[in-house]
Amino acid sequence: MLALKLMQNRTRYQHQGSTPETLTKILQDDTNLAVWQRQLPLHISDFAQLLLSLNEPLAESLCLELPKEDAEPDLTGLASGFRDLEGYEGFVADLKWLVSAFACLLGAKRIGLRLRVLDKAMCPRFHVDHVPVRLITTYAGVGSQWLKEGTMDRQQLGQANAEPQAQIQQLNSGDVALLKGEKWHGNEGFGLIHRSPQPATGERRLILTLDWLG
């Protein structure tokens, strides 16, 4: 019985589903990835594609304070250079919903938000995050890549020749993923192994990340 318990404690699972309730799986001790496989509303995906088509830079960060459970995140001025594009208000409304859902699920009072347009892999080698949990969603472009538990020797993280190319999993555009990191209590040594994808030449991606800061 003790051996079985020890084996269970050293196993991590990844869950994917078509409803937002799937994200609650991240709270389970034996889970280090939960993915809501969502289909983006057309007005949001159209906005994201239009934004990318302008070939303008975007790299914005916010530290959001949410002192009360029902506090609405203040995203005033976020991506304001694109406010005249059709679909901007719906896009910001979606960002607010994700921030609120993230805060509600984790009981977070402070959240770090990053919204970026990328034309290259920000973190091209497989790695783990030294945070409790991170939300990642790609609004347009290729999604982040990850590995199932046991696919790669963690001692070889960062070494390109050790990466199992045939076993790489990939998120789709629109998917909302919660990635458990090394600083989640009890998850030390089991942060999800993942990396940024390399966009094709001339392609870009619009990505949102949320970090639980407190």
Protein language model features and the residues they cover:
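N-terminal auxiliary "cap/dimerization" subdomain that precedes the catalytic jelly-roll/cupin core
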Residues: M1-A79, E89-W97
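Glycine-rich, charged/polar anion/phosphate-binding loops
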Residues: P20, A121-P124, L192-R195
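Short, surface-exposed beta-edge/turn micro-motifs
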Residues: D30-L33, P132-L135, G174, R204-R205
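Short helix/loop capping segments that flank catalytic or ligand/cofactor-binding pockets
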Residues: I44-D46, W146-K148, K180, N187-E188
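Extracellular-facing segments of soluble proteins and assemblies that are Gly/Ser/Thr-biased and enriched
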Residues: T76-K120, V128
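Active-site environment of non-heme Fe oxygenases that use a 2-His-1-carboxylate facial triad
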Residues: L95, L115-V117, Y139-E149, D211-G214
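Catalytic core of non-heme Fe(II) oxygenases with the double-stranded beta-helix
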Residues: K120-D175
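Catalytic core of Fe(II)/2-oxoglutarate
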Residues: P164-G214
